[in-house]
Design a protein with these regions (language model features):
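Short, Lys/Arg-enriched, disordered terminal segments
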Residues: 1-6, 159-162
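A structure-centric signal for secondary-structure junctions around beta-strands
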Residues: 3-5, 70, 95, 150
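Fold-level signature of zinc-dependent metallopeptidase catalytic domains
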Residues: 3-16
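Generic structural signal for residues positioned in beta-strands
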Residues: 7, 73-75, 99-100, 134-135, ...
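Metzincin-family zinc-dependent endopeptidase catalytic domain
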Residues: 13-116, 124, 128
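The catalytic-center signature of Zn2+-dependent metalloproteases
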Residues: 105-162
Length: 162
């Protein structure tokens, strides 16, 4: 069973106004028992790609999941991220473990950021990309991410509950 506790690590550069309302949103959507928000103390330089000027998102996810012994962990970072084979990613997730979300391309828009966090946490809870109008729709650009729904479709909602 996936933990019902969430620990959010926030890049200290990110304005608190960006994450106002995030805690209530995540409790409503995912029914977390507890959410703890704290500033990220250190981002490992080993995850930084100097040629690309981006963080490798899977490296960040491995790092934060090794630092948090129990529960789901979410890193919200201000820098750009990528994974092998893609120019950039809004985020990356691992089922039952946690997620990394970069706000670099999300225009400092709290609703846009919540949408991408909801998407990545959907993956943490086992959801795949969805082809219906849904927050789980794959986005390959800022435009596509902007256009997708802010909530789960009925199919994904049912899958989350099972």
């Amino acid at each position: 069973m996936i933990s019902s506790d969430l620990r959010i690590l926030v890049d200290p550069i990110i304005s608190p106004s960006i994450i106002i309302g995030l805690e209530n949103h995540l409790i409503d959507v995912f029914s977390f028992d507890s959410i703890e928000i704290s500033k990220l103390v250190q981002i490992p330089s080993s995850c930084w790609n100097t040629v690309r000027q981006q963080f490798e998102a899977n490296c960040l996810l491995a790092y934060i999941s090794s630092q948090i012994p129990a529960g789901i962990v979410l890193l919200i970072i201000s820098k750009d991220t990528y994974i092998q084979g893609l120019n950039f990613v809004f985020g990356v997730a691992s089922k039952g473990i946690g997620a990394v979300v970069s706000i670099y391309r999300l225009e400092n828009d709290p609703e846009f950021i919540q949408k991408e966090i909801t998407h990545e946490l959907g993956h943490v809870f086992g959801l795949k990309h969805c082809f219906l109008p849904c927050v789980m729709t794959f986005s390959n650009s800022v435009r596509e991410a902007r256009l997708k729904n802010t909530s789960f479709c009925e199919k994904c909602r049912k899958e989350m509950k099972s």
